[in-house]
Amino acid sequence: MADVAVLAELRGIDEERLKPCADWVAAHADTHLPIVAEMDGHVVGAAWLLGVQRVPSNESLDRWYGDIQSAQVRSEYRNRGIVGALMAAILIEARTRGLLHVTVHSGRRAVDFYLCNGFSHHRQILLLEAAASPRPA
């Protein structure tokens, strides 16, 4: 696995939060896989594939889906196809793991990128923003 300090730095995590970040990465190693892009021996980008097990059904007791999280490339390495290579690696991993589907919560600027990589808008995936929802009394 890539050095946690490098992954944290890519995410903009402050140095004083490095230990809790490393603890989080270790605690989530079974569900969160970082895929890294390197150039000249340096990590220049990363993206995470979250694997989540779904409730069993009659068709399968082993149902998993994926979610792409935190795809980032250092600004000086952008527009070189790196994020495309990260996406290709993530989608290969998703197929290897037999994930039913892969979702992504994208920023506006990246929507077209994901659409060009096979993603589509889906009418059955709904989102409730936790901050906007009322909390139970």
Annotate each language-model stretch with its function.
Residues 84, 96, 100-101, 107-130:
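Conserved active-site alpha-helix within GNAT-family acetyltransferase domains
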Residues 32, 63, 68, 121-123:
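Short coil/loop residues immediately preceding or within conserved phosphate-binding loops
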Residues 14-38, 48, 54-55:
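Active-site rim helix/loop that mediates acceptor-substrate recognition in acyltransferases
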Residues 73, 79-92, 116:
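Conserved acetyl-CoA-binding loop-helix of GNAT-fold acetyltransferases
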Residues 53-68, 78:
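A conserved beta-turn-beta hairpin within the catalytic core of GNAT-like acetyltransferases
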